[in-house]
Amino acid sequence: MTHQTAVSSASPTNRSHHKPHYELIALPARSDNYIWLIRNQTHAWVVDPSLAEPVRDYIAQHGLTLADLLITHHHYDHVEGIVELAPWVQGRIIGDSERIHGLTERLHAPTEFTLSFSDVHAQVLSTPGHTYDHVSYYCPHLLQTPVLFCGDALFSAGCGRVFDGTMAQAFETIEQFIQLPDETLIACAHEYTLSNLDFALRIQSAHEATQAHLNQVKYARERGLPSLPSSIGLEKRINPFCRAVSIGLSTEPLDTAWIEGLNHLAQSVQLPAVSLANVDTREPNARKALALALFTLCRELKNRI
């Protein structure tokens, strides 16, 4: 059984009645979902309630009032708890899709808003790809570091499958994410980290940062602890999709060992390799086109493997 995990907003020395103390809680649900719960001493705010029971149990156990529900997209494993939790909600049920039933307020990107009964500011980010209307919620000052609630748009060492969005949209969403501060915490909705790291190491088995993180995640998971939240800085080092997208934003020499590993893996499952021939890496548009091609190949490979 996976246990809850908490990330705190304040050390004991800087907590006071002038600055509410917030915590970020990962509530396990279903086989691999996390329901993210923000709490202070009196209220709770919940992201993507895939089930009602874990939320109800937590707020009852801790004597909290359920303030808001924040929804990233319409898939059942992100919304199934809405109907049952709605009578408990004292604030709003927020999302940005007509396909999400039970919303009380639609907030369109790039809206900035404040969580009900709090001083926590959040931004709605348009993050399509996994679905065409997927959004994420960015809280720049929730904890001592920013927090990104990104649903299925980004996972630790991976990203969501492209369903009714497009590959270009998914690419641009990751491009948006990796330009956030490196210390930004990634609160994604699924515990896929081990399988994603295995995939990353099939591309480049000798990558030290990825191997080191795999060892850390195995240690945590063997003890029933979540591998999340991750961070933008970590994902830029270990996530194949972030590494591909980063090529389009960088002027550094290409990591040819990683690209060769990706192409070798592609050829092993009869997918065409991405050619570096005639790519002028000094030209920004050429680098971005290469980055998109590598990102697309990563996604097609992950779908197969």
Go through the PLM ranges and name each one.
Residues 2-11, 175-185, 194-305:
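Accessory terminal helices/loops
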Residues 14-64, 137-151:
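Conserved beta-strand hairpin/beta-sheet module of binuclear metal-dependent hydrolase folds
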Residues 30-31, 44, 51-126, 145-146, ...:
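Active-site HxH/HxHxD metal-binding segment of metal-dependent hydrolases
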Residues 37-39, 112-143, 179:
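Core dinuclear metal-dependent hydrolase active-site scaffold
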Residues 38, 48, 85, 152, ...:
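Residue-level signal for inorganic ion chemistry
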Residues 49-51, 74, 98, 130-131, ...:
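Active-site metal-binding loops of divalent metal-dependent hydrolases
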Residues 103, 157-163, 196:
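A short acidic, helix-capping loop that chelates divalent metal ions and anchors anionic groups
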Residues 158-184:
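Active-site-adjacent loop/tail segments of enzyme domains
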